[in-house]
Amino acid sequence: MASLVPLKEKKLMEVKLGELPSWIMMRDFTPSGIAGAFRRGYDRYYNKYINVRKGSISGISMVLAAYVVFSYCISYKELKHERRRKYH
């Protein structure tokens, strides 16, 4: 049975594997579309973890942990070479 929701309006987790290539081609890959996607993601994160009634440190600590992991991954190449040095 065909889905009642058009393919363009489906979320990624609702798309079947056979529909995935056509769903990807329907996405907006212009700079404004990509900026809009990042904006929606930021708004979703902000409303879920930061802008809550009983807020805690968890939302900000997740961002901080992601920053630490990301910066470690970026500087891993230099850290790998420093690990083998004995004196300098």
UniProtKB/Swiss-Prot annotation:
The chain crosses the membrane at residues 62-79. The modification N-acetylalanine is found at A2. One of its GO terms (biological process) is proton motive force-driven mitochondrial ATP synthesis. It is a single-pass membrane protein. The modification Phosphoserine is found at S3. Keywords: Acetylation, ATP synthesis, CF(0), Hydrogen ion transport, Ion transport, Membrane, Mitochondrion, Mitochondrion inner membrane, Phosphoprotein, Transmembrane, Transmembrane helix, Transport. It comes from the Eukaryota. One of its GO terms (cellular component) is mitochondrial inner membrane. Pfam families: WRW. It is found in: Mitochondrion; Mitochondrion inner membrane. InterPro entries: F1F0-ATPsyn_F_prd. One of its GO terms (molecular function) is proton-transporting ATP synthase activity, rotational mechanism. The modification N6-acetyllysine is found at K16. Its main location: mitochondrion. Component of the ATP synthase complex composed at least of ATP5F1A/subunit alpha, ATP5F1B/subunit beta, ATP5MC1/subunit c (homooctomer), MT-ATP6/subunit a, MT-ATP8/subunit 8, ATP5ME/subunit e, ATP5MF/subunit f, ATP5MG/subunit g, ATP5MK/subunit k, ATP5MJ/subunit j, ATP5F1C/subunit gamma, ATP5F1D/subunit delta, ATP5F1E/subunit epsilon, ATP5PF/subunit F6, ATP5PB/subunit b, ATP5PD/subunit d, ATP5PO/subunit OSCP. Belongs to the ATPase F chain family. Subunit f, of the mitochondrial membrane ATP synthase complex (F(1)F(0) ATP synthase or Complex V) that produces ATP from ADP in the presence of a proton gradient across the membrane which is generated by electron transport complexes of the respiratory chain. ATP synthase complex consist of a soluble F(1) head domain - the catalytic core - and a membrane F(1) domain - the membrane proton channel. These two domains are linked by a central stalk rotating inside the F(1) region and a stationary peripheral stalk. This is ATP synthase F(0) complex subunit f, mitochondrial. The gene is Atp5mf.
